[in-house]
């Protein structure tokens, strides 16, 4: 299928919040070219979901083969132990040289060792789920895929699952059909641990999205973004006007705002859990997981290597608000002045601003929450700018559409599709209207954030 056709389908899906029934027969037929996905337990494009739940009845680990899938003779499987510096270095090199680039090959993700340690070593992680493929002769790592355990709530049902991420095949070997083999092998290994469901995301359309969200970008350093061609100068605007438009206050506004500390975790987690209850798909965190994902790694001494930034608002000993964002910079490939672009990503947050209202969409409660989140996320942008980030990204997920436009987040070209493996569910709204604008009225029911 051509890239143009995929984009057209992506646009249609985002307009319909992932509802496959609104695709034409010809569009569905085109999507059937994804032969691999036709063999997998995923919702088909022309399938009418009548009941939520597993697609295949659960087997037992004893039903799953013990041996890994066969590879071409020149390749071999390996388990990557990210506690081993040399093995981590191999993943670092593979992803930084071969992972997602933009179409013009001007930018690509610059994954750091600190980021991998954070993203791949959550509680319950196992080297067996960090799978690599090496060349037998040279031992060069040429492919990678990872899974970490997560506990998902899909509406009222809680399911043990994994989160699949960092699927990467070396550019020169993408004709070898390694991707389907990697997916099948990670599935086999996860099934052997008695887990039968997975959450994953992709920018492309696969069978069949649970939801579709749109990216939004808030410039923090407009002048640099323009110079590296990350953004354009709008018609009838000057550079000085654009810099002035996106200039932020030098100091945060929220009284009682400070970094999240270990002693805050019980209060912050309780606040977070109550806030998350409004969404249809979320990850449920244990206390140990909450500490891992939101308490900054004290072993990272250098501030410029810090990955996650988490803050709470404390009022008279009570935690009333919480927000977090993480850093994942870009490498700039063709610029003599700048080598990297600092990128902040809005992560999870919670506020008690509307807790006294039973209806999430109560007019007064919505107004209070919008005001509170706008202040908190602007403070997040200020802190990100202070930490040398040049742009702040968010999705149309969670309650983000309440503040994106007011805080000068512009809609991006990219969309992110959410998928569930071996689990049927009705479409979940992704915060988009039919014309792909941010849906401030209905917002999103997606409460899970993937890296």
From Swiss-Prot:
What is one term from the GO cellular component aspect held by the record?
A: cytosol
Q: Which reaction does it catalyse?
A: N-terminal glycyl-[protein] + tetradecanoyl-CoA = N-tetradecanoylglycyl-[protein] + CoA + H(+)
Keywords, alphabetical = Acyltransferase, Cytoplasm, Transferase
Pfam families noted in UniProt? NMT (PF01233), NMT_C (PF02799)
The listed locations are: Cytoplasm
Q: Which InterPro entries match?
A: Acyl_CoA_acyltransferase, NMT, NMT_C, NMT_CS, NMT_N
The answer to whether the entry has keyword Methyltransferase is no
Q: Which family does it belong to?
A: Belongs to the NMT family.
The protein here is known as Glycylpeptide N-tetradecanoyltransferase
């Amino acid at each position: 299928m051509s890239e143009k056709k995929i984009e057209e389908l992506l646009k249609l899906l985002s307009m319909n919040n992932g509802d496959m029934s609104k695709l034409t027969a010809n569009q569905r037929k085109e999507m059937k070219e994804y032969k691999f996905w036709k063999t997998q337990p995923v919702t088909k494009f022309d399938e009418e979901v009548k009941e939520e739940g597993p697609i295949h009845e659960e087997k037992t680990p004893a039903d799953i083969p013990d041996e890994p899938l066969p590879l071409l003779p020149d390749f071999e499987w390996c388990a990557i132990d990210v506690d081993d510096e040399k093995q981590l270095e191999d993943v670092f090199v593979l992803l930084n040289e071969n992972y997602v680039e933009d179409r013009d090959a001007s930018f690509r993700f610059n994954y750091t060792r600190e980021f991998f340690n954070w993203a791949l070593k959550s509680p319950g992680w196992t080297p067996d789920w960090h799978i690599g493929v090496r060349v037998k002769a040279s031992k060069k790592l040429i492919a990678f895929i990872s899974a970490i355990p997560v506990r998902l709530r899909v509406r009222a049902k809680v399911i043990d699952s994994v989160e699949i991420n960092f699927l990467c095949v070396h550019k020169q070997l993408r004709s070898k059909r390694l991707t389907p083999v990697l997916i099948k092998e990670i599935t086999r290994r996860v099934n052997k641990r008695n887990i039968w469901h997975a959450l994953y995301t992709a920018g492309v359309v696969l069978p069949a999205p649970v939801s579709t969200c749109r990216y939004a970008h808030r410039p923090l350093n407009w002048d640099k973004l323009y110079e590296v061609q990350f953004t354009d100068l709008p018609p009838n605007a000057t550079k000085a006007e654009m810099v002035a438009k996106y200039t932020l206050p030098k100091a945060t506004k929220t009284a009682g705002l400070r970094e999240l500390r270990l002693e805050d975790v019980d209060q912050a987690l309780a606040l977070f859990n109550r806030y998350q209850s409004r969404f249809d798909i979320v990850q449920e965190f244990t206390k140990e997981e909450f500490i891992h994902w939101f308490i900054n790694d004290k072993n990272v001494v250098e501030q410029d290597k810090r990955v996650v930034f988490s803050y709470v608002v404390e009022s008279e000993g009570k935690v009333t608000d919480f927000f977090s964002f993480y850093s994942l910079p870009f490498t700039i490939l063709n610029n003599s002045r700048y080598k990297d672009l600092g990128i902040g990503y809005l992560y999870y947050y919670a506020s008690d601003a509307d807790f006294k209202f039973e209806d999430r969409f109560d007019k007064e409660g919505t107004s209070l929450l919008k005001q509170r989140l706008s202040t908190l996320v602007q403070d997040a942008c200020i802190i990100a700018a202070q930490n040398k980030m040049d742009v702040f990204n968010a999705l149309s997920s969670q309650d983000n559409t309440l503040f994106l436009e007011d805080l000068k987040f512009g809609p991006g070209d990219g969309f992110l599709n959410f998928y569930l493996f071996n689990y049927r569910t009705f479409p979940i709204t992704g915060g988009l209207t039919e014309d792909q604008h941010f849906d401030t009225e209905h917002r999103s029911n997606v409460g899970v954030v993937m890296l």
